[in-house]
């Protein structure tokens, strides 16, 4: 299944979550797109709620269904709560870490930076967005890429880095200190609904 490439603004409004991370999609019209706009009152079934939650998280991380399901299955083989393990695995993806460090303004930008070879892990170039970052590993920007406008501007406006990460803006180097806790990850996601969706 191909990655979704349609309007993120419409998709954000339909799902009720900012897929870009900027929140701009919901500022003027915080309701689903369509003819009836804010007057839509369609009640979702249990399956519909589960599907919507799955789609929210999948589109948030910009993953194909196969990538998303594979990560979900890997999380199920780990000790602990399946849903929480899943959220932690997603947050440990290289593109997610690059975004959380503030090197990109959106997750899509972060994925592109990785794809184009601008990001190093422990000093070695890694161009796989799904690469799973491990605690104590360092993430940095390739020297030739450090003056890219997208990176410079992102770092300038970013004023928050999660506690499970360390970041030095001068050297554009971050450290994945530890695995994140569930409370440090997107609160607008109910991962239990996703577990129920795949358990049907």
Swiss-Prot record:
Origin superkingdom: Bacteria
One GO cellular component, as annotated: small ribosomal subunit
Recorded GO MF terms: rRNA binding; structural constituent of ribosome
Occurrences of domain S4 RNA-binding (ranges): 92-155
Example GO biological process: ribosomal small subunit biogenesis
Classification via SUPFAM superfamilies: Alpha-L RNA-binding motif (SSF55174)
Assembly information from the UniProt record: Part of the 30S ribosomal subunit. Contacts protein S5. The interaction surface between S4 and S5 is involved in control of translational fidelity.
Family: Belongs to the universal ribosomal protein uS4 family.
Function, in words: One of the primary rRNA binding proteins, it binds directly to 16S rRNA where it nucleates assembly of the body of the 30S subunit. With S5 and S12 plays an important role in translational accuracy.
Protein name, entry field: Small ribosomal subunit protein uS4
Source species taxonomy: Bacteria, Bacillati, Bacillota, Bacilli, Bacillales
Gene of this entry: rpsD
């Amino acid at each position: 299944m191909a990655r979704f490439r349609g309007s993120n603004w419409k998709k954000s409004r339909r799902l009720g979550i900012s897929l870009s991370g900027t929140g701009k999609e919901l500022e003027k019209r915080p309701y689903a797109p369509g003819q009836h706009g804010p007057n839509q009152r369609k009640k979702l079934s249990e399956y519909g709620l589960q599907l919507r939650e799955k789609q929210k998280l999948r589109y948030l991380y910009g993953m194909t269904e196969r990538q998303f399901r594979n990560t979900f299955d890997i999380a199920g083989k780990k000790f602990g709560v399946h849903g929480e393990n899943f959220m932690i695995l997603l947050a440990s993806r290289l593109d997610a870490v690059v975004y959380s460090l503030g090197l990109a303004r959106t997750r899509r930008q972060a994925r592109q930076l990785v794809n184009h070879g601008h990001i190093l892990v422990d000093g070695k170039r890694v161009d796989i967005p799904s690469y799973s970052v491990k605690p104590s590993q360092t993430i940095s920007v390739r020297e030739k890429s450090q003056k890219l406008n997208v990176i410079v501007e992102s770092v300038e406006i970013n004023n928050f880095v999660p506690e499970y990460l360390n970041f030095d803006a001068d050297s554009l180097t971050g450290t994945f200190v530890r695995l994140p806790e569930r409370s440090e990850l997107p609160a607008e996601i109910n991962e239990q609904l996703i577990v129920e969706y795949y358990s049907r």
